[in-house]
Amino acid sequence: MKRMLTFLLLVATAAPALAHPHVFVEMMTEVVFAADGKLRGIRHHWKFDDMYSAFVTANLAQDGKDPSPEQMLPIARTNVESLKEFDFFTAAKVNGAVVKFDEPTDYSMSYDGKDQTVTLHFVLPIEATAKPAKTFVFQIFDPSYFVAFAFQRTGPATLEKAPAGCSLSVSKPGSLSAADQKKLADSAGTMNSPGEDIGMKLADSVITACP
C-alpha cells in the first residue's frame, strides 16, 4: 500500500499478509442538522474488526478491566487526525456539488467487552454552503479497498434534528464488472490493491432529501 493511515500501518505490521481487504469496519451514521434546520454534517460510528481492536487495546486493559474511553481518547485523536489526509474516507455532495469537511469534532472511542471490539465515534462537519441542502449524498469507502466499510444491517443511517419532510435512504451499488471481479480475485493473498476505485464501486450511497 502506498497510502496507509497510522492505525492501519500498525495493523499491517502486526498481522500477516491477507487478501484485500485487510481491515473490516461496520458502520452506522447519523446525518445531523442544526437547530436552525441547516445541514451540520455526519456523525460516524465505525466498529473495527476484532484483530484491529485487540491490537490497539493490548496494553490498555488493567486488572482484567475493559479499556476506558479516557484510555482510548489518544487513539481516537490519532485516528481522526490521520483520516484528514484521506478526506475521512467520505465523499459527499450537497445539491449535486462536491463539498469538503471541516475538522472533526466530538471524537471518542468505546470498547464493547462482549465482542471485544472498539468503535470510533466522531462528527464530520460539512463546510458552510450558501444554499439550503435540498439533497445530500455521501459514500464511505477506501478507494483501494485496504479497508472494507459496510453498514450495519439494522438502522444503518438515521436523521438527527432534520426539518419536517426530510427523508433518508441507502442505495446499494451495482454489481462489479467481470474485469473488476478478476482484479479483486487476483489481489487475494497479496498486498496489492485490486484498483484505486474498487472501494467506491462497492460503496453504498446514503441519500438525504429535504423539501
Q: Which residues does each predicted region cover?
A:
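Sec-dependent signal peptide recognition
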Residues: 2-10
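Mature, soluble, non-transmembrane domains
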Residues: 95-211
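A general structural signal for short secondary-structure junctions and capping/turn motifs
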Residues: 9-10, 82-83, 197-199
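Structured domain cores in non-transmembrane regions
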Residues: 51-130
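N-terminal signal peptide c-region/cleavage motif recognized by signal peptidases
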Residues: 14-16
